[in-house]
Amino acid sequence: MSKALLKFVRLSPTKARLIARQIQGMNAELAIASLEFTPNKAARVLSKVVASAVANGSLDAKSALIVSCRVDAGPVLRRSIPRAKGRATAIRKPTSHVFVEVVEGKEMKSSKSHKKNQAEGK
């Protein structure tokens, strides 16, 4: 199992989680290919993190499976914008921490059946 972590990326966690849910459980090569054609900033960021996780474990992208893809909220950068009558309102610029775990294809099947057995109570 290999992991990759990207912290403090200027990206909304809610928007990134939409893309992260789509690639969870996918083949790494297929996930990277599908993320290339997704017109979203989160897709570009997640594609790089998945590629990094595959490279960290020196795995082949064709046989690697994404076990978990998690996006956690980072600190929020607070900025202000001038408004009428001398006031200022706050602008929130959220950041995210992206975490990806990748395993070889054969290991994934055993862990999936293990999770299924746990869910059934066996």
Swiss-Prot record:
It holds the Pfam family Ribosomal_L22. GO terms for molecular function: rRNA binding; structural constituent of ribosome. InterPro entries: Ribosomal_uL22, Ribosomal_uL22_bac/chlpt-type, Ribosomal_uL22_bac/org-type, Ribosomal_uL22_CS, Ribosomal_uL22_sf. Keywords: Ribonucleoprotein, Ribosomal protein, RNA-binding, rRNA-binding. The keyword Ribonucleoprotein applies. GO terms for cellular component: cytosolic large ribosomal subunit. GO terms for biological process: translation. Gene3D superfamilies: Ribosomal protein L22/L17. It comes from the Bacteria. Residues 103-122 are annotated as: Disordered. Belongs to the universal ribosomal protein uL22 family. This protein binds specifically to 23S rRNA; its binding is stimulated by other ribosomal proteins, e.g. L4, L17, and L20. It is important during the early stages of 50S assembly. It makes multiple contacts with different domains of the 23S rRNA in the assembled 50S subunit and ribosome. Part of the 50S ribosomal subunit. This is Large ribosomal subunit protein uL22. It comes from Helicobacter pylori (strain P12).
